[in-house]
A protein has these predicted regions:
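Conserved mid-sequence domains
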Residues: 235, 252-255
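N-terminal low-complexity or simple alpha-helical regulatory segments
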Residues: 1-76
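Short hydrophobic beta-strand segments that form the core of ligand-binding sensory/regulatory domains
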Residues: 59-61, 80-82, 125-132
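Terminal helix-turn-helix DNA-binding modules in bacterial transcription factors
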Residues: 226-234, 238-246, 262-304, 323-330
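Alpha-helical bundle regulatory/interaction domains
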Residues: 92, 97-220, 225, 242, ...
């Protein structure tokens, strides 16, 4: 049995341990705690609301490829419910395989010893709910019983043998998660509590569908996809054939495309086009370089084609986009 002090402080310890990680800062306020990520490769925030002793909900906003984790937190094992609002999140499973949480996916798991959380698309928004079950049952057992919420049964049903359950939320679950998400900017403790209890009731009383059985990738497959992405984006002026990259890693072109789509959620051509356009947008906003030069920098020798692709993504021509950013920065 864990000591009472450890039980009382599990969520506190997670936050305090995270505060020791480079680039992560903990800010406390009367009604919440926020972890802020500020690194050269991006920013993010996780805002934590304690709803009951032993039950904490966090809203996650990330614009970065990685959120580092404290090694100390791997020793703490809260029950977790994750829900992806947008973006993609990489999950390392206990058997060493990887799976990707995408929009409207949810998972129920125990904390795993991940050294960092990976967001392949560099953008992620979601909800994470932490359960310190011994403390929650000790402090709110009668309340949970009055609502017929048997959380040990929930844990056993979804995480038997320490497995991770992942699936797409059905319409009823999605509706509850979205009600919670709409409170992310203007939280109401009462409504957060009510909707979280509603979520637990639904999870306990719905028919549990078989978890996803596809979309699992080995460490090698994930590494091949990530290295391919690095090669493709290192110099956007270059147009490197996918076949050439596949040969470099001794896999078929089809396999490489499948690994890539599994990790990034897009085919290679769509992903690379967005990378090119996002870099062009950055150069238009942050520099005074001529548009023709920027076009070549991101791999378009034909400025007209560049302008058409750019407008399709951003709704403005490159010149209009630059002017709008100049007005914003005045």
């Amino acid at each position: 049995m864990k000591g009472a002090k450890q039980l009382r402080n599990m969520i506190y310890n997670i936050l305090e341990n995270s505060d020791t990680v480079s680039g992560v800062t903990l800010k406390n306020s009367p009604n919440s705690s926020t972890l802020l990520l500020d690194r050269t490769d991006g920013k993010g925030r996780m805002t934590f609301h304690t709803l009951f002793p032993g039950l904490t909900l966090a809203f996650i906003f990330v614009n970065a490829p990685v959120w580092p984790e404290s090694d100390e937190n791997s020793n703490l094992k809260p029950l977790l419910i994750n829900y992806c609002v947008s973006g993609r999140s990489e999950l390392l499973l206990d058997d060493g395989s990887y799976i990707y949480l995408k929009e409207n996916d949810f998972c129920v798991s125990e904390q795993t010893a991940q050294k960092e959380y990976i967001f392949p698309t560099r953008q992620y928004q979601g909800i994470k709910i932490y359960f310190d079950l011994p403390l929650l049952l000790q402090s709110c057992g009668e309340l949970l019983k009055s609502f017929s919420l048997d959380l040990p049964t929930l844990e056993k049903s979804y995480c038997g043998n320490h497995k991770t359950y992942i699936n797409e939320a059905d319409s009823e679950l999605e509706n509850i998660f979205q009600k919670l998400w709409r409170l992310s900017e203007r939280p109401s403790a009462f409504h957060l509590q009510i909707y979280t209890l509603e979520l637990l009731h639904r999870l306990l009383n719905m028919e549990i569908r078989p978890p996803k059985t596809c979309g699992f990738y080995t460490e090698t497959q994930v590494e091949i996809a990530k290295r391919a992405a690095q090669i493709l984006s290192d110099d956007l002026r270059q147009h490197i054939p996918v076949r050439q990259i596949a040969e470099r890693f001794s896999v078929s072109e089809t396999s490489l495309k499948n690994y890539f789509r599994g990790v990034y959620g897009q085919n290679i051509s769509t992903w690379l086009r967005e990378i090119r356009m996002n870099e062009a947008a950055r150069l238009l906003s942050d520099t005074k370089r001529p548009i023709a030069e920027i076009s070549e920098q991101v791999g378009y020798s034909n400025q007209g084609k560049f302008a058409a692709v750019f407008k399709k993504q951003f709704g403005l021509s490159p010149l209009e986009y630059r002017r709008s950013k100049n007005l914003e920065n005045r």
